Amino acid sequence: LAKRADICQPGKTSQRACET
């Protein structure tokens, strides 16, 4: 699911990236 944890974490740049 999450490729990058840094962008996947809540409050970060893109939480949507977690779904991609």
From Swiss-Prot:
Tissue expression from the record: Expressed by the venom gland.
Gene Ontology MF terms in the entry: toxin activity
Cellular compartments per GO CC: extracellular region
Name the record gives this protein: U27-ctenitoxin-Pn1a
Location of region: Disordered: 1-20
Main location as per UniProt: secreted
Compositionally biased region (Polar residues): 11-20
Source organism, top-level taxon: Eukaryota
